[in-house]
């Protein structure tokens, strides 16, 4: 990608001058990318981050914990196969670089499970892991029906009462909320309304 190498050179100079590696943004003429080269590979973004968001990303470098060593809350998920699913997800997200430092390996993961096997509880346990390990600040939970949104919000509120939550199908948006629940059409309308 054009611009990436030049942005990396600027980041090297800024690190020398200020003693801290910056978060890198670079365009290629059509798209813009963000790159925390100490942790994740680059990815496309739609705009720039605020000063507070950049500070949080830099702070996470020191406070982010290894997901592979997280102890799953057994009051949320009680079954061995659920623990195994969460552990495999954690291993999918994390790797070590050649020097042994923690690195992000993937930003997405997929669990496919049959009806009645505890998808909502496993999701709550994964959110618990990601928030307590300082990998996620906010979480968006999407469902195809209002009833499933309500059910998920109630389950998350029961198992993760320390995280604020909102159902966008019924409540007004609040930027400080940690857990956001919505249907696909509701969130698409919110996105379209921002354009």
Model-predicted regions and their roles:
Residues 1-138, 143, 147-163, 175-179, ...:
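ATP-dependent helicase/translocase motor core
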């Amino acid at each position: 990608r054009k611009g990436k190498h030049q942005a990396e050179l600027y980041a090297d100079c800024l690190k020398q001058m200020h003693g801290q590696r910056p978060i890198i943004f670079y365009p290629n003429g059509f798209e813009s990318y963000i790159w925390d080269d100490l942790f994740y590979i680059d990815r496309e973004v739609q705009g720039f981050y605020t000063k507070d968001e950049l500070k949080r990303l830099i702070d996470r470098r020191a406070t982010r914990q290894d997901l592979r060593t997280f102890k799953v809350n057994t009051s949320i998920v009680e079954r061995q196969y659920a623990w195994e699913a969460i552990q495999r997800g954690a291993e999918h997200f994390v790797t070590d670089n050649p020097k042994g430092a923690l690195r992000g390996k993937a930003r997405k993961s997929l669990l496919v499970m049959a009806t009645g096997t505890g998808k909502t509880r496993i999701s709550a346990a994964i959110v618990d892991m990601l928030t307590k390990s300082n990998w996620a600040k906010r979480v968006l939970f999407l469902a195809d029906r209002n009833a499933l949104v309500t059910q998920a919000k109630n389950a998350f509120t029961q198992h993760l009462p320390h995280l604020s939550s909102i159902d966008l199908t019924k409540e007004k948006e609040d930027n400080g909320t940690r857990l956001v629940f919505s249907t696909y059409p509701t969130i698409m309308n919110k996105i379209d309304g921002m354009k």
